[in-house]
Structures are given as C-alpha cells and as structure tokens.
C-alpha cells in the first residue's frame, strides 16, 4: 500500500487545501485533518470527503468511516512552513531536552532571523532555521528561547480564548 499521507496529499492537490494529518483510529475510522489559510468551512470538508472516498475506493484503502475536519484552535505545528506561517501567534512547545528543569514553554512565536543573525552558535544546526519564542519567565520578565525544529518534541497553537464575551 502506498503511503497514505502522500496519497491523500496528491488527491487534494489543486484544491487550495492543506493536509495537516491522516490518522487511523479504532473501529476502522480514518480521520483526515485539513486546513486553509482563510479557515475550513463545512463545504470544504464535504468536498474533500467526496474526493477522498473516490480515491480511496480506487486505491483499495481499507476503512469503515471517513472523518474530515479542521485542526481546531490548538492545531499542531509540524514543519518549517507551518512555523513561518504562524509567526506572531501564541504557541506551546515541548522541548526534547529540559532547559532549566523545564520542557514546556508557551509564548509568542518569532520568525527566524535572516542568515543566522541571531548570534547563536550555528555549528550544530547548520542551515536550519532558528525560531524564537517570547515567554514570560517571571512576572514582567520577558525572555526569548531560541530553537530549531530538531530541538522540539511537539508544538501546537496555544490561543488565549475569552469565553466571557462582551459586557453590555
């Protein structure tokens, strides 16, 4: 069987849809997560579902149910393009190795500085983008953590949601 992610990505080519994830779950569920720059609409999910149903049938992909949805507000970030796209947004990262006894950091993602101008020793990550994360170490003490994608175990958007609404 061909790589399911690659097959799905190929099937969605030209649809202005970004494939975020393909996951097999219990009881034959095949979960496909998509995104668009201007947000995922229900019509996008319907269109992708119809397209993938046909492709998966032709390719003999075994599944009982197909679920197509958006990544939600806490969307995972997996590659450099996604990190660049969400620069300026609040994210949460988990480092592979603890830093000052801490692995999980939340803050504002900074885009990489051009040509290694960060002042970091670039020998370990030669040619790799060095991103920054502005976080509050202590109250009113903003620090910047520099990292490459190899330094992190996982990352996701971490928006601050206000459920109180406007007061009238």
UniProtKB/Swiss-Prot annotation:
Cite a GO CC annotation: cytosol
Give the top-rank taxon of the lineage listed in the UniProt record for this protein. Bacteria
According to its UniProt entry, one GO biological process term is: ribosomal small subunit assembly
The yes or no answer to whether the keyword Cytoplasm is present is: yes
Q: Give its localization.
A: Cytoplasm
Record-stated family? Belongs to the RimP family.
- Name the UniProt record assigns to this protein: Ribosome maturation factor RimP
Q: Which gene encodes it?
A: rimP
């Amino acid at each position: 069987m061909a790589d399911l992610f690659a097959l799905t990505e190929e099937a969605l080519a030209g649809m202005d849809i970004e494939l975020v994830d393909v996951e097999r779950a219990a009881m034959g569920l095949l979960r496909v997560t998509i995104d668009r720059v201007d947000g995922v609409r229900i019509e996008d999910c319907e269109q992708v579902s119809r397209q993938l149903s046909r492709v998966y049938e032709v390719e003999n992909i075994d599944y009982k149910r197909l679920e197509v949805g958006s990544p939600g507000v806490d969307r995972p970030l997996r590659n450099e393009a996604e990190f660049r796209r969400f620069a300026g947004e609040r994210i949460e990262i988990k480092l592979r190795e603890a830093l000052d006894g801490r692995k999980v950091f939340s803050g504002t993602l900074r885009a990489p500085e051009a040509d290694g101008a960060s002042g970091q020793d670039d020998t370990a990550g030669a040619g790799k983008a060095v991103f920054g994360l502005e976080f509050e170490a202590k109250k009113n003490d903003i620090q910047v953590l520099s990292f490459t994608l190899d330094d992190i175990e996982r990352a996701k958007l971490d928006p601050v949601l206000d459920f109180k609404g406007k007061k009238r």
